[in-house]
Amino acid sequence: MIKAIIGKIIGTRNDRWIKQYKKKVLAINALEPTYEKMSDDELQNAFEELKKRVRSVEKDLQEKTLLEVLPESFAITREASKRILKMRHFDVQLIGGMVLNDGKIAEMKTGEGKTLVATLAVALNALKGESVYVVTVNDYLAHRDSKEMEPLYHFLGYSVGTITASVRDDDERLEIYSKDIVYGTNNEFGFDYLRDNMKYSLEHKVQKSHAFAIVDEVDSILIDEARTPLIISGPVDRRMENYNKADEVAKSMQVEIDFTIDEKNRTILITEEGIKKAENLFGVDNLYKIENAALSHHLDQALKANYLFFIDKDYIVANNEVVIVDEFTGRLSEGRRFSEGLHQALEAKEGVSIKEESQTLADITFQNYFRMFSKLAGMTGTAQTEATEFLEIYNLEVVSIPTNLAIKRKDLNDLIYKSEKEKFDAVILKIKELHDKGQPVLVGTASIEKSETLHALLKKERIPHTVLNAKQHTKEAEIIKDAGLKGAVTIATNMAGRGVDIKLTDEIKELGGLYIIGTERHESRRIDNQLRGRSGRQGDPGTSQFYLSLEDNLLRIFGSDRIKGVMEKLGLKDGEHIESKLVTRAVENAQKKVENLHFESRKHLLEYDDVANEQRKSVYKFRDELLDVNYDISAKIAENREYALNQIFSKLKAFDHQNLSEEELLGLKNILKEDFNAHVGLEDLKKASPIENFIAEKLKSDYENKMKVLDSEQRSRIERIVYLQILDNAWREHLYTMDNLKTGINLRGYNQKDPLVEYKKESYNLFLELIEDIKMEAIKTFSKIQFEDEQDSSDAERYLDNFSEEREHESVTYRHEEALDEDLNVAMKAFAKTPKRNEPCPCGSGKKYKDCCAKSGPKKGLFAK
């Protein structure tokens, strides 16, 4: 209350920002007459001068210079837009551009021209000479926006590229990323970053810098998708029959007897009776013994699949596959899979083919990917409800931009009914009334199931209509565009189709504009605001109203008893509703509860991922050093050799190495032979003084003798590639260990320990072990490198060529969240460590190692026995 009064007197922080930006708008507008008089060539030359000015200063002074040239850059960009696109930036759009350049989020209502606004900040920041990324939510918008704005950018002397899922060729991707301005989806940018850190050449990395990114629909990408990391993964060996058996057991269990459901937290707790039943059906005496850990895990996931996840709401079944439905957009999430075996549990539930579980090979959250950028900005129509999260997680402030024309849309109070049937009956009556009048109506639903219920009711009443949900996602843009036609009735799930304007004719405006009906409040107020925002664009008339029932999930799970109490006191008859600001406010309070739960969940995820992120950055930095041809890899190998020997001697009983017993010397001899391929006689060890110097020289001379056949470039390439393989394999194993650690860490809470603190401690220790393992594995592998002909380097060159060729033709699938793809083990088998007897032979024969090269020696020269 006090805050509101102070805001009215001195203005809010947002008001003060807008006031400052308006002063700069005056400066930009003052330049317009000057640039209007220029020819195209003169205008382009003026912009080229700005490029020279910005690029001539030191890098750390470029941001300051950008602010100095901002008025000229914005004025030239606007003039160019007038000539090329036939569109002039409004003053409020200039403000939006300045907000983006300041690294903030511009909240602009639907229809205010966010795509055009972005050109101002993009053109300005591209002056520095580093690629600017424009991030969108789907391939359609990335392609549309880049093609629409490309003529403007070309006029200003910029090149433009678009990254979509259809761009498969690595060289083509490399070419696109070399452009001044790159449009693409958040998934493509994120996966390209992960792919870059699996490349074996710096020249093949596509993302050269992370200077500036503008994220369109920033709330969808940085908030809604923050809980689902990008993961590249490979298959894990699991027994597929366990999924089906667990599904049978789960289906036989009864709610409230064998298990209880916590709908608020979406968890299931098995009772003692349930445990006994499961043990009986699985045929085990104790479900929670260590050897039965896989069974108990499968059962947990099967229970979730059967009782917390629902077809046509959380997923659909299409083409013998379970496909996730995005809870926020209603779109199908093609290629995305639930993690930790949940997706396999859903496949067992629905009786479709079960795909293998997968192991993480590389991963990152959107939070940590986008926080890498030196400057980050965003645009959306709905951000203020999440302003705290944007500031706390991303250090992004939200600035609400005034509309160019006043909003005329009427937002009516919610209507609340006792039952869902009564609610839908009322919705159908309202739709019929509007349709008969010719006024277009857009109906928002919370799930595919509800949209199809409404579809059936409208069909029964013979009211023509169009349905847009995940099953019709390919026609999304076309359906949304036509939603403003006379008499149009459009049903849309969770307001998919963002980014597509619904334009109205004068006749429709006379009828009252687009009428929005929400059939259920979403868990997030922001999603509801997005639905409302489809109406009333650019000063158009319109109306919005939500129809609710006490049976809706939000009110049933989170709604206060006050709403139910009011309904009971009023003694409403069938079909009657209540409409009051008090009830609407109570509904919004319920939404705030859920929003806070989701915020805490995302923050919790980030706290854990921040631990892994520091390790990821460290590993990727070292990886880049190895890729650098100027890095002294030979010195690193020598350092590892010294470390390995220190480790060996530290484990021997007598630290006085000259007084080792014969038994210890024999053990040392065997270690040198097995681990380092060094053949040393027992008598030589007895005579050596000091022994550590003798061994160090022996290992070094053996290695140098093998490497003599290579020229310096060949040697450097081989050493770097082998070391990279060792690093990559160790990192993947580390990620697997970290996944397992994270899965069980919450159990520490029962022991009065903070799981996050425990996770930090243990992950740090695991990281130290990772570093040690890499050093030891590196020196062991390098010690075993051999050539068939020690006088000929062609063997090494052949393997380098094969390596490059096989890497180039790897077929790998990258997916959002949990992805299944071909195993990423690099085909340069010659450099692999000695396999175990039952592992596949690295020569590629397809036989087990014990039946192949273990008997006859390696078929390929670089692999040592």
From Swiss-Prot:
Cellular component GO terms, alphabetical: cell envelope Sec protein transport complex; cytosol; plasma membrane
Membrane topology category: Peripheral membrane protein
Record: residues binding Zn(2+): 841, 843, 852-853
One Pfam match: SecA_SW
Cofactor binding mode and count: May bind 1 zinc ion per subunit.
Presence of the UniProt keyword Cell inner membrane in the record: yes
Compartmental location: Cell inner membrane; Cytoplasm
Biological process per Gene Ontology, one example term: protein transport by the Sec complex
Annotated positions binding ATP: 93, 111-115, 501
Needed co-factor(s): Zn(2+)
EC number: 7.4.2.8
Keyword check for Membrane: yes
Swiss-Prot/TrEMBL keywords: ATP-binding, Cell inner membrane, Cell membrane, Cytoplasm, Membrane, Metal-binding, Nucleotide-binding, Protein transport, Translocase, Translocation, Transport, Zinc
Domain of life of the native organism: Bacteria
Catalytic activity: ATP + H2O + cellular proteinSide 1 = ADP + phosphate + cellular proteinSide 2
GO MF term list: ATP binding; metal ion binding; protein-exporting ATPase activity
Chain's role: Part of the Sec protein translocase complex. Interacts with the SecYEG preprotein conducting channel. Has a central role in coupling the hydrolysis of ATP to the transfer of proteins into and across the cell membrane, serving as an ATP-driven molecular motor driving the stepwise translocation of polypeptide chains across the membrane.
Family under the similarity heading: Belongs to the SecA family.
Subunit comment: Monomer and homodimer. Part of the essential Sec protein translocation apparatus which comprises SecA, SecYEG and auxiliary proteins SecDF-YajC and YidC.
Protein name in the entry: Protein translocase subunit SecA
The species this protein was found in: Helicobacter pylori (strain Shi470)
Lineage, uppermost ranks: Bacteria, Pseudomonadati, Campylobacterota, Epsilonproteobacteria, Campylobacterales
Gene that this polypeptide is encoded by: secA
